[in-house]
């Protein structure tokens, strides 16, 4: 029962061919000249088919691992969850820690241009905790937990073995108390160990730091992950590679044999201004990332706006300039208060204090040579022109490739301009920076690119399609007692015929009770499906493109036909609150809710254990519904005791191939996800009523002030735009550029790449008038790309998964080694962007239609705003802006119909 993770209004949410049936039991992995294997989600279960769901069987966690190891890991995880049942709130992000160094992995010194190094696991790795680096924790306990993961990035003949290959176990060992309280980068060990999550005890080396910061805590554990060789951080190799990082292949002797692993050095180990001498054939310097800087580096220029997404202060309020990067911030906007138990520095931003990287393919503001800031896009190292890779900063730690995004007239055939800049000179683009654009044209471009990336940014995270940890035939009680009801009727019904006990003439069926077992003595009884654990043969489990797994009809299902029982753990109110609170504490935006209210304070939760019914998705326009019935338990002197169960039944005819859906009808819990079913009557929530805004005591006064201020703001915006339009008709100022204004009509809209393209040859005489505009000069670190044609291959730039492919003709020493796994990665074509309607805040002229802050709702609002309607009205969309650490900022966008 997965909430939609994408735009549910799309037509491509049908089951995918080839993913409908799950494979059978897996055999232990044997390494025999294997170059590639399909990646298996760490912690995801595996099902044979819907026929196997009548067994109470636990799904394997790592399909390639030996079964005895899987069984042992399951028992260890259950024992840990039983011992540490109380969920610990680590007070993140208010209190956090730095990323712990890997003291037990010794890496030999290497130079900035070397791609290989030697490593060795020290003897202390088997006896000390990787967090506190001690044998005993603060309470004096010396018990160590062994990580259930495996070393990432194993290579063979110069190629990375794709997939999670359980060949070499992770060497991390840790105290339970140390790992539970370790929350660097939003890591939450206790939450990841839950049976509905990863169901294993994993250290941070198996969790993508970028996905975790973006609150995608299920995607963080799947896919190809690269470990940092110097600290307990890891990143998805292709989709979340940190800008400013560099690769390092580490050779480690394991079992008497040298094994090579592809790792990275993350940009958190970059020291600005460090005394670094490069490769010399007579003398090799020490590892560049371990050298102490000469002195504190003072940044010469900063972005004069707060870098915190949730900033609510005026743009004119005074900001603090970060001493280690180009960002500025308000002291009250920072969420982090203490780091390693000490107050954070007053003159550093959160990103520098916590070492948060910027993923590649992210919109940024980057500093130009004249200390001005321009819109750019971070790129992979190997998107940089081959002929210019001799640059001294190419693949250097702390530097990244950026492509400048500047509008130009009639430059469709010209190539983009790229630079190599230090990561301390870039900052992720936020709405707070829009006011810094030098003119309206640049501001429009910044806003347009920001909206484009906002719709696709998190799609870079691996798509997760998980199965249930354990399968149940019927529901079971979890730490609560059944609330049985007595039914004073011991007589068997008088139903006859082949379809007996299917009509309301059956006294048990009419009272919503199942027949007692003795009814089967008269013939086949059709009113005992729930007790017998029957699942309709007309349904199948299938993976969708945007909603995880779903349940589809493989034959016509008639109205009122029984489908299956909704199976799970039956929990009470206290346990329900505890489970929902743990999701809120963990800040997991991918958490799925499988709870269905039963009766008298009891709830069925299918998150950990269940059957195929847990995969039935929610819809505000369903074709099935949940019903309550009473099932026979035992006889008494006066009658029989019955228990309450819930089951799914069709409420209209369901054709072959249609997805089966029903309305969850949950109470309006604050921490439940929004509905994304995409139905015309979507209520915006999975609850029983439409989600309304909370009322305040002085709501009328605040509303009046808000309307008044919005009117003034609207008039000011119109005046400002008219003035800028007049200025654009005349000569521009020297500090501004005057490119053509991007079109907003769907007919003439251009792709991301076409608007961002840069000419191969430029008329420098015409550009000298605009002194602040980037120009390619001889001897600078800039170069124009001549071999990469982004107009023919826009997916190389726009794909949420970077290709990271090496050019064979590279002149750098790194290109001389064997080809890596990047040569085999294919880029994906980006989705076609539709024209965005006006986002002006206007006065409401009719009935306002409210939608939740979801992609499907925004898509629907945009569609409505372009339709011809008899009486114009305003379409409101509530949008959530989420900061790096989870602060949620809600705003309302209004689309004026055309």
UniProtKB/Swiss-Prot annotation:
Q: EC no.? A: 2.1.1.357
Basic and acidic residues bias: start-end ranges: 692-704
Q: Name one Pfam family in it.
A: SET
Tell me, what is one Gene Ontology molecular-function annotation carried by this entry? histone H3K36 methyltransferase activity
Question: Where would I find the PHD-type zinc fingers in this protein?
Answer: 126-214, 303-355
The record's note on what follows loss of this gene reads:
Derepression of X-linked genes in the germline. RNAi-mediated knockdown results in sterility. RNAi-mediated knockdown suppresses the multivulval phenotype of the lin-15A/B n765 mutant. RNAi-mediated knockdown at 25 degrees Celsius rescues the larval lethality phenotype of the mep-1 (q660) single mutants.
One of the GO biological process terms: dosage compensation by hypoactivation of X chromosome
In what residue span(s) does the SET domain sit?
A: 537-665
Keyword Ligase tagged = no
Determine the domain of life of the protein's source.
Answer: Eukaryota
Location relative to the cell = Nucleus; Chromosome
Where does this chain mainly localize? nucleus
Which keywords does this chain's UniProt record carry? Chromatin regulator, Chromosome, Developmental protein, Metal-binding, Methyltransferase, Nucleus, Repeat, S-adenosyl-L-methionine, Transferase, Zinc, Zinc-finger
UniProt keyword Lipid metabolism present = no
Segment Disordered: which positions? 1-68, 689-847
| Compositionally biased spans, kind Polar residues | 36-51, 774-788
UniProt catalytic activity: L-lysyl(36)-[histone H3] + 2 S-adenosyl-L-methionine = N(6),N(6)-dimethyl-L-lysyl(36)-[histone H3] + 2 S-adenosyl-L-homocysteine + 2 H(+)
Under InterPro entries, the record lists: Post-SET_dom, SET2_Histone-Lys_MeTrsfase, SET_dom, SET_dom_sf
PROSITE patterns attached to this UniProt entry: POST_SET (PS50868), SET (PS50280)
Tissue expression per record: In adults, it is predominantly expressed in the germline, and weakly expressed in intestinal cells.
Question: Basic residues compositional bias: what residue ranges?
Answer: 705-719
Q: Which SUPFAM superfamilies match?
A: SET domain (SSF82199)
Q: Give the record's family classification.
A: Belongs to the class V-like SAM-binding methyltransferase superfamily. Histone-lysine methyltransferase family. SET2 subfamily.
Task: Please give the function described in this protein's UniProt entry.
Answer: Histone methyltransferase. Dimethylates 'Lys-36' of histone H3, a specific tag for epigenetic transcriptional activation. Plays a central role in early development and is responsible for all H3 'Lys-36' dimethylation until about the 40-cell stage. Indirectly involved in the global inactivation of the X chromosomes in germline cells, possibly by excluding the mes-2-mes-3-mes-6 repressive Polycomb complex from the autosomes. Not related to transcription elongation. Required for small-RNA-induced H3K27 trimethylation. May suppress sensitivity to RNAi.
Q: What is this protein called?
A: Histone-lysine N-methyltransferase mes-4
């Amino acid at each position: 029962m997965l909430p939609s993770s994408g735009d549910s209004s799309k037509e491509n949410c049908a089951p995918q061919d080839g993913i409908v049936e799950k494979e059978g039991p897996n055999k232990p992995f044997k390494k025999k000249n294997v170059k590639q294997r399909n990646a298996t989600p760490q912690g995801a279960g595996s099902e044979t088919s819907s026929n196997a769901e009548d067994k109470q069987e636990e799904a394997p966690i790592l399909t390639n691992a030996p079964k005895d190891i899987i069984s042992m890991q399951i028992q260890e995880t259950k024992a840990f969850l039983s011992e540490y049942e109380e969920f610990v709130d680590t007070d993140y992000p208010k209190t956090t820690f730095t990323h712990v160094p890997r003291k037990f992995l010794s890496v030999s010194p290497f130079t900035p241009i070397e791609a290989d190094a030697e490593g060795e696991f020290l003897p202390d790795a088997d006896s000390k905790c990787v967090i506190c680096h001690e044998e005993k924790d603060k309470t004096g306990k010396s018990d160590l937990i062994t990580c259930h993961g495996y070393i990432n990035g194993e290579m063979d003949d110069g190629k990375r073995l794709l997939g999670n290959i359980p060949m070499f176990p992770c060497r991390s060992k840790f105290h339970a108390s140390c790992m539970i309280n370790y929350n660097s980068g939003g890591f939450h060990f206790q939450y990841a160990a839950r049976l509905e999550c990863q169901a294993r005890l994993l250290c941070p080396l198996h969790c993508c730091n970028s996905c975790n910061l973006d609150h995608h805590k299920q995607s963080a554990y799947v896919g190809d992950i690269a470990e940092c060789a110097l600290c307990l951080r890891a990143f998805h190799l292709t989709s979340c590679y940190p800008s400013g990082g560099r690769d390092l292949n580490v050779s480690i002797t394991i079992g008497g044999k040298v094994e090579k692993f592809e790792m990275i050095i993350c940009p958190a180990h970059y020291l600005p201004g460090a005394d670094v001498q490069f490769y010399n054939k007579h003398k090799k310097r020490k590892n560049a990332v371990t050298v102490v800087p000469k002195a504190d580096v003072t940044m010469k220029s900063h972005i004069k706006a707060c870098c915190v997404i949730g900033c609510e202060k005026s743009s004119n309020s005074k900001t603090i300039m970060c001493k280690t990067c180009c960002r500025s911030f308000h002291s009250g906007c920072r969420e982090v208060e203490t780091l390693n138990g000490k107050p954070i520095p007053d003159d550093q931003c959160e990103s520098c204090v916590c070492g948060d990287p910027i993923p590649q393919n992210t919109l940024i503001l980057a500093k130009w040579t004249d200390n001005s800031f321009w819109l750019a896009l971070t790129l992979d190292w190997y998107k940089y022109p081959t002929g210019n890779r001799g640059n001294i900063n190419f693949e250097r730690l702390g530097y990244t490739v950026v492509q400048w995004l500047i509008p130009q007239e009639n430059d469709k055939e010209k190539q983009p301009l790229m630079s190599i800049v230090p990561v301390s000179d870039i900052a992720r683009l936020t709405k707070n920076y829009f006011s810094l654009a030098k003119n309206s044209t640049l501001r429009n471009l910044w806003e347009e690119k920001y909206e484009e990336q906002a719709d696709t940014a998190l799609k870079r995270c691996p798509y997760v399609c998980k199965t249930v940890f354990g399968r149940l035939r019927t529901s079971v009680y979890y730490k609560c007692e059944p609330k049985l009801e007595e039914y004073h009727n011991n007589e068997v019904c008088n139903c006859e015929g082949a379809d007996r006990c299917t009509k309301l003439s059956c006294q048990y069926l009419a009272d919503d009770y199942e027949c007692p077992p003795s009814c089967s003595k008269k013939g086949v009884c059709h009113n005992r499906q729930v007790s017998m654990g029957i699942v309709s043969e007309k349904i199948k489990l299938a993976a969708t493109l945007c909603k995880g797994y779903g349940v589809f009809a493989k034959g016509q299902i008639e109205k009122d036909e029984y489908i299956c029982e909704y199976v799970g753990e039956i929990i009470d109110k206290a346990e329900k609150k505890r489970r929902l609170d743990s999701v809120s504490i963990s800040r997991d935006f991918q958490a799925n809710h499988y709870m269905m209210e039963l009766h008298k304070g009891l709830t069925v939760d299918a998150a950990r254990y269940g059957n195929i019914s847990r995969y039935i998705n929610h819809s505000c326009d369903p074709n099935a519904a949940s019903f309550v019935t009473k099932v026979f338990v035992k006889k008494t002197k006066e009658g029989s005791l019955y228990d309450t169960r819930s089951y799914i039944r069709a409420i209209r005819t369901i054709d072959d191939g249609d997805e089966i859906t029903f309305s969850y009808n949950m109470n309006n819990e604050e921490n439940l996800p929004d509905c994304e079913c995409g139905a015309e009557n979507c209520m915006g929530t999975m609850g029983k009523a439409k989600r309304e805004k909370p009322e305040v005591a002085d709501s009328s006064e605040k509303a009046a002030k808000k309307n008044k201020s919005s009117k003034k703001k609207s008039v000011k915006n119109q005046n400002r735009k008219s003035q800028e339009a007049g200025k654009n008709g005349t000569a521009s100022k020297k500090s501004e550029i005057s490119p053509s204004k991007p079109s907003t009509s769907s007919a003439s809209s251009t792709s991301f790449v076409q608007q961002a393209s840069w000419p191969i040859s430029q008329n420098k005489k015409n550009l000298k008038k605009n002194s602040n505009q980037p120009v390619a000069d001889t001897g600078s670190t800039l170069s124009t790309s001549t071999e990469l044609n982004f107009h023919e291959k826009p997916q190389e730039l726009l794909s949420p998964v970077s290709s990271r492919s090496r050019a064979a003709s590279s002149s750098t020493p790194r290109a001389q080694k064997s080809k890596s796994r990047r040569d085999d990665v294919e880029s994906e074509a980006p989705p076609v962007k539709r024209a965005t309607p006006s986002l002006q805040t206007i006065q409401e002229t009719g009935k306002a239609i409210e939608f939740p802050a979801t992609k499907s709702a925004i898509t629907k609002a945009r569609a409505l705003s372009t339709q011809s309607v008899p009486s114009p009205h305003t379409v409101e969309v509530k949008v959530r802006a989420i900061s790096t650490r989870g602060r949620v900022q809600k705003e309302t966008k209004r689309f004026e119909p055309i």
